Amino acid sequence: MTMTDIALVVLIALALAYAIYDEFIMDKLKGKTRLLVPLKRMNRLDTLIFIGLVGILIYQNVMSNGAIITTYLLISLAFMACYLAYIRRPKLLFKSTGFFYANIFIPYSRIKNMNLSEDGILVIDLEKRRLLIQVTQLDDLEKIYKFMIDNQ
């Protein structure tokens, strides 16, 4: 195995670990999920460019009679990128003591202010940071509001 193959295996393993954490583990952390809200997908064009570049690498590897394992690893990397960007749904998980946003748990005590922008983006101000949450359906903003009021 070359250094390139090792790097590809590490990248694929990290992407797979992230996908497993996001899909199965995060739901079970920090207690029962009280509300799950699907979010808008972001960076689709970036992933399409990345998959195109990986496709160029696959073509280059096949045309130069490169190692077959490298080709399979590049194909696997392209499939993982496709899954993470187009199949997996980003979500906002509300728990009893906080919520998961971008796979990071944020306790409710860190929230300093909440606002709703004109274009339907929920803005949550934390101590040092501002979260911009874009939901897929505007009705979900009402669910979030009701959940936050009921649990304060």
Curated annotation (Swiss-Prot):
Membrane topology note: Multi-pass membrane protein
Gene Ontology cellular-component terms listed: plasma membrane
Family label: Belongs to the UPF0266 family.
Entries under Pfam families matching the protein: DUF986
Keywords: Cell inner membrane, Cell membrane, Membrane, Transmembrane, Transmembrane helix
InterPro entries per the UniProt record, alphabetical: DUF986
Full protein name: UPF0266 membrane protein ECA2388
Superkingdom to which the source organism belongs: Bacteria
Subcellular location: Cell inner membrane
Membrane-spanning intervals of the chain: 6-26, 45-65, 67-87
Chief localization: membrane
